[in-house]
A protein has these predicted regions:
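A conserved FAD-binding loop/helix module that cradles the flavin
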Residues: 363-394
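Iron-sulfur cluster-binding cysteine motifs and their immediate structural context
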Residues: 1-6, 27-56, 115, 146-148, ...
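Flanking helices and flexible, charged tails adjoining ferredoxin-like Fe-S electron-transfer domains
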Residues: 47-49, 53-83, 102, 106, ...
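Glycine-rich dinucleotide-binding loop and its adjacent helix/turn
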Residues: 56-77, 136-156, 180-234, 340-356
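Feature captures the FAD/FMN-dependent oxidoreductase FAD-binding
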Residues: 4, 78-85, 135-185, 275-288, ...
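Ferredoxin-like iron-sulfur electron-transfer modules
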Residues: 13-32, 68-85, 92, 121-122, ...
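FAD-site-proximal beta/loop scaffold in flavoenzymes
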Residues: 189-212, 297-370
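Beta1-alpha1 glycine-rich phosphate/pyrophosphate-binding loop at the start
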Residues: 3-7, 13-19, 42, 46-50, ...
Length: 524
């Protein structure tokens, strides 16, 4: 935020990419947990961190201004020669490829689809995330040395054993949750009943360009919102969402719900599907819902209860089920020792992501279940650390590893009464563009003036935590930090005596002599 406030956008982008290789994507689709933690929210409204990041990352969309991180040259001969395979080009796989390439590897990314991005490309609507943004971010990773092989499904076109024979030393499996779930009710096997991930994939692939009639969406999460908004923009006469939860319990965010209603979708809370009705030709003509009286039990577990006598039937031309996602493994793990747990997710070490098959690491939705892009990006970063250590002889996956534990600022201890009350900047919504091209991005990027105004709202409350197990007080970090963000102060000068450089040798000489005598004669 400080670099952006000073207009040092190139440096700001470089700093962002230390932790997030896909800032232009996250600036559009992130769930903004950083803003939830922003201290400015105690004054009025949180700083629009995501919008500022989006502005900075716009530089990546132009070849003349994009930032391609320098790649480490680890050996005299050049980069590392160990071959690493990344299976899946979603956010986790792209993140892992980025950080491995930065370390000097040439990772190979296998993607079964014809385009990279995973659910970023085939799940998130284009009016939220234009696909050329994804292509621009991927191009940077390619320029860093990663290789992308599209249209290759590992397990079908090539097996893990065959890749091992080709010299691959480690594998990162990040195929995401590409399957959907049905509700297990009568009539759901009809042609006009589909699952959300398949529906979104067809829309984003251009296979659906119009959707007349009535569309009923079952589910209350952000994916269900995306389905409903797509249906509205494709011309459905009536779009309605039905979910088990009350409005306060809905998984979808308040912002997502508001945008769906603005697009023309209706939301009915407290209903669960009972039966899909078909006409004489076997086509969907309606669906019956039953009142949901309770979603979770006393221990907070998902255990819905219904009133079977309180029913509601609605007409429908199609039904889209958005009640969960599943992992489609295919033959990827055939013959491997990788173990699967709840929901068919891969079991792995929670810190290193290593599975029971030592050279196979997992991450993203195949490990956590459906989650947000930023979580997958973080997992890919950690996997890159693990894989780097794994392929280097004599290395450990855990010792000396950055635990990356988040230490929250005590916001109750911050004095906020004296700060100004400048209002939060809001990105312009271009309704004319939205009307003319419903599937183009219509929320515009901040202007430079807005960025200056918004970054000025930052309270600068960030705090750094020093690891006393590693820091020896040498001060080298203060000279190496490219952003001049580190300063070393002597809180307890009485613990040691400071001497000028010219007097260093005489002052250290007696201690060096004493130590040499102890070593030579074994004195303790």
């Amino acid at each position: 935020m400080k670099l952006a406030a000073q207009g040092r956008y190139d440096e700001a982008l470089a700093l962002i990419k230390r932790e997030n290789p896909l800032p232009a994507i996250c600036g559009r689709v992130c769930n903004r947990r950083c803003e939830d933690a922003c201290t400015r929210g105690r004054v009025d409204a949180a700083v629009a961190i995501d919008e500022v990041k989006k502005f900075i990352a716009q530089r990546d969309l132009d070849a003349a201004t994009r930032y391609v991180p320098p790649v480490v040259t680890p050996t005299r001969a050049g980069g590392f020669d160990q071959k690493i395979a990344i299976i899946g080009a979603g956010p986790a796989g792209l993140s892992c490829a980025f950080y491995l390439a930065e370390k000097g590897y040439k990772p190979v990314v296998f993607e079964k689809n014809e385009r990279p991005g995973g659910m970023l490309t085939y799940g998130i609507p284009s009016f939220k995330l234009q696909k050329d943004v994804i292509e621009a971010e991927v191009e940077i990773i390619r320029l860093m040395g990663a290789e992308f092989r599209y249209g290759v499904e590992v397990g079908r076109d090539v097996t893990l054993d065959e890749l091992r024979e080709q010299g691959f030393k480690a594998f990162y499996v990040a195929i995401g949750c590409q399957g959907g779930r049905l509700a297990g009710i009568p009539g759901e096997d009809a042609e006009d009943v589909t699952v959300a991930v398949d529906f979104l994939r067809e829309v984003n692939s251009g296979k659906i360009d119009a959707l007349p009639g009535r569309t009923i969406v079952v589910g209350g999460g952000n994916v269900a919102i995306d389905v409903a908004r797509n249906a509205c923009r494709l011309g459905s006469e009536h779009v309605e969402m039905f979910c088990l939860e009350s409005e306060a319990q809905m998984p979808a965010s308040e912002e997502e719900r508001r945008e769906a209603v603005e697009d023309g979708a209706h939301i009915s809370c407290g209903w669960g599907p009972k039966e899909v009705h078909l006409d004489e030709s076997g086509r969907v003509c309606g669906i019956t819902f039953k009142r949901c009286t309770r979603v979770f039990d006393d221990e907070g577990r998902f255990a819905p209860e219904y009133d079977e006598n309180d029913l509601r039937r609605v007409d429908a031309d199609r039904v889209v089920m958005s009640i969960g996602q599943s992992i489609v493994w295919g033959d990827l793990l055939a013959g491997s020792k990788v173990e699967l747990g709840r929901g068919q997710g891969a079991l792995a070490d929670p810190q290193t992501y290593q599975t029971a098959e030592p050279d196979i690491f997992v991450g993203g939705d195949v490990y956590t279940g459906p989650s947000f892009a930023i979580d997958a990006i973080a997992a890919g970063h950690e996997a890159a650390v693990s894989i780097h250590r794994f392929v280097q002889p004599g290395s450990t996956l855990t010792i000396g590893r950055n635990q990356r534990r988040y230490t929250a600022l005590d916001r109750d201890d911050v004095v906020i009464e004296s700060y100004d009350n400048a209002s939060r900047e809001v990105a312009h919504v271009n309704r004319d563009r939205e009307k003319a091209a419903p599937f183009s991005e219509y929320v515009e990027t901040f202007t430079e003036e807005q960025v200056r105004a918004e970054t000025a709202r930052c309270l600068g409350c960030g705090a750094s935590i020093v690891d006393p197990n590693k820091c020896i007080g040498c001060g080298l970090c203060t000279t190496k930090c490219a952003f001049d963000a580190i300063h070393l102060d002597r809180d307890r000068p009485e613990c040691s005596t400071m001497v000028k450089y010219e007097q260093k040798l005489p002052s250290l000489g007696k201690y060096a002599l004493k130590r040499a005598i102890k070593i030579k004669f074994g004195r303790k």
